[in-house]
Structures are given as structure tokens and as C-alpha cells.
């Protein structure tokens, strides 16, 4: 199931413009900050959430770089 989620996420972000990707990146970074804070204060129910968000940030950064190299945006 995670494989399907990952592929769907990649398909979705590849369709977005650079501006949309940068906005998504900001949202993901904010989510990671919230998770880090929550982890310190009360602990996380699912620690894998942080890992998932970090990997999604990396995926978005990769797609942004791909688009920059192709001259899109």
C-alpha cells in the first residue's frame, strides 16, 4: 500500500508548477516542525510519520530540481 501512495504522490507533484511545489514544500516543512515539537512535548503515536514527511520533502526537492534543470517554470 505504501508503494502505491508513494507513486501517487510522485505523479501528483510532477504535475504541479514550481510555485505550487514551493508552496507544498513550505507546508511539508511546517508539518515536520509540528511533528518535531509534538515529539518533544508528548511523543508521537506513529514515529514513522516524521520519516514519511522527511522523505516527501526530499521528493519535492528532487522534482523542483528536475524542473529547474529542464528549464520549466
Curated annotation (Swiss-Prot):
Pfam families: Ribosomal_L29. One of its GO terms (biological process) is translation. One of its GO terms (molecular function) is structural constituent of ribosome. The keyword Repeat does not apply. Keywords: Ribonucleoprotein, Ribosomal protein. InterPro entries: Ribosomal_protein_uL29, Ribosomal_uL29, Ribosomal_uL29_CS, Ribosomal_uL29_sf. It comes from the Bacteria. The keyword rRNA-binding does not apply. PROSITE patterns: RIBOSOMAL_L29. GO terms for cellular component: cytosolic large ribosomal subunit. NCBIfam families: L29 (TIGR00012). Belongs to the universal ribosomal protein uL29 family. This is Large ribosomal subunit protein uL29. It comes from Aquifex aeolicus (strain VF5).
